């Protein structure tokens, strides 16, 4: 009897794993770059501590190698702290693709590590999105007197979408 129950459990687990693998679609979004305008508001600026809030609005160029997000827009707001030359921060980003479907995520910066990105939620084809990865700033202009600047960032990693 125990062997039959064990065999049934193994069969059920195998079928469940097979269904889960078929029920999800994973995509590698490496090669994605978004460029836009950032506005920084400094709260504290000193030799040992700088704290600022920032807001970024940008777009993924149509020639992006990651086709699902060509012409997508992104809006992020965040908090950053530089203490003894080390960056710490957190931000939330809202993405809208060319069809109007959206997804949201958050980024976390910790000292001496690449920035980490996690998908939180989505609408339309992104409903149930999960996954994450890292990101880096790939181009940055000089900051203007008003705290604004242009920059590009490139996330790398994978997302999983339910089928």
What are these regions (language model features)?
Residues 1-8:
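Bacterial N-terminal signal peptides that target proteins for export
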Residues 8-16:
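Bacterial N-terminal signal peptides
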């Amino acid at each position: 009897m125990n062997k039959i129950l064990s065999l049934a459990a193994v069969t059920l687990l195998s079928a469940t794993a097979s269904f889960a693998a078929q029920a999800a679609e994973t995509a590698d979004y490496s090669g994605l770059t978004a460029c836009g305008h950032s506005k920084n508001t400094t709260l504290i600026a000193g030799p040992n501590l700088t704290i600022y809030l920032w807001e970024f609005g940008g777009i993924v160029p149509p020639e992006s190698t990651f086709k699902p997000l060509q012409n997508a827009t992104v809006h992020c707001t965040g908090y950053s702290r530089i203490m003894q030359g080390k960056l710490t921060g957190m931000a939330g980003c809202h993405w809208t693709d060319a069809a109007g479907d959206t997804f949201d995520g958050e980024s976390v910066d910790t000292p001496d590590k690449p920035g980490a990105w996690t998908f939180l939620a989505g609408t339309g084809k992104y409903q149930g999105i999960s996954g994450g990865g890292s990101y880096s700033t790939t181009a940055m202009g000089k900051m203007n007197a008003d705290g604004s600047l242009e920059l590009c960032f490139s996330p790398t990693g994978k997302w999983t979408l339910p089928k």
